[in-house]
Amino acid sequence: MYVLEVMSGPLDGKTWAFEEQITIGRDDAVATACITIDRYISRKHARLYREEDGRLRLADLASRNGTRVGGRALGEPEPIGLGEPFVIGRTTLRVTRS
């Protein structure tokens, strides 16, 4: 089980648990992790998913303001380490194990 945690932003400290994948966005109709209060986040902004080999991968879902990892814009989906911060809109998040 993984935990997606808001490190800083409008919902500081908020967490969501997931096993295989989680979609992050502003619209709870399409996003499992819904952050409605950050207007820089798209309806369906990014997805975290576990690959067959167990690694986590982060994908931007053609969001308007992009997804940033290590200060750079995310292009193609790429692996992300546990605890590694990433930014969507004005919100910084990370994934840990529960």
Language-model features and meaning:
Residues 14-92:
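Forkhead-associated
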Residues 1-6, 12-13, 52, 91-98:
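Regulatory inter-domain linker segments that are low-complexity and enriched
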